[in-house]
């Protein structure tokens, strides 16, 4: 956690690479949120939240969290509600200040790098699966329909990769448009994830629902 992504360009790139690796290995820990912590507060991590029923995937973690809205209102997380699915819990907040506008862009961009790592891994596993699995005496990868689906997924992944690099550069340069770039990246990441995960799930067939290795 000694990386300094807010004031050091090398630290910013290293933080993005670390988040991508965490996503690739499906690490069940909010690495991006820890790395995005504000430099002017004594806190362990930053959570970008919505205005109504704020929640985050930090259930069971006892770290000191700071939450920030898109308009820069920062709050201290004083408690958590019951843990829901995927480690998500509602947050109890105490407003701290309204000085968090500069914190938001990085808090949005780094989690997108985590999601990008997940897409990297999903496509890698799917390519390996269709190259091994056979139907009608041929590997799945030899069928044109499968190739088209994988191409669509890779186009989404590679497009997100380029946009993530641009948004990271925008944050590092402290451009006035950095927040807009971060929001565009977030929207693109969610759209790409829907397509990539759907394709990968479909091409894994029943393996997507059960363990066929035993």
Segments from the language model and where they lie:
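FAD-binding core of flavoproteins
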Residues: 24-124, 128
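Alpha-helical interface subdomain recognition
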Residues: 1-25, 108-214
């Amino acid at each position: 956690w000694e990386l300094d992504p807010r004031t050091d360009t090398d630290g910013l790139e290293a933080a993005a690479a670390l988040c991508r690796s965490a996503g690739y290995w499906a690490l069940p820990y909010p690495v991006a949120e820890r790395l995005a912590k504000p430099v002017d507060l004594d806190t362990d991590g930053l959570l970008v939240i919505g205005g109504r029923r704020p929640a985050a995937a930090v259930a069971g973690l006892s770290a000191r969290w700071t939450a920030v809205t898109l308009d820069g209102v920062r709050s201290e997380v004083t408690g958590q509600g019951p843990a829901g699915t995927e480690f998500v819990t509602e947050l109890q907040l105490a407003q701290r200040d309204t000085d968090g506008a500069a914190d938001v862009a990085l808090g949005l961009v780094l989690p997108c790098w985590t999601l990008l790592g997940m897409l990297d891994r999903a496509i890698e596993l799917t390519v390996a699966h269709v190259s091994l699995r056979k139907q009608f005496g041929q590997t799945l990868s030899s069928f044109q329909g499968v190739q088209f689906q994988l191409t669509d997924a890779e186009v989404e992944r590679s497009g997100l990769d380029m946009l993530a690099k641009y948004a990271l550069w925008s944050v590092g340069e402290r451009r006035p448009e950095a927040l807009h770039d971060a929001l565009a990246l977030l929207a693109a990441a969610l759209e790409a994830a829907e397509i990539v995960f759907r394709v990968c799930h479909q091409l894994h067939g029943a393996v997507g629902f059960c363990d066929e290795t035993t």
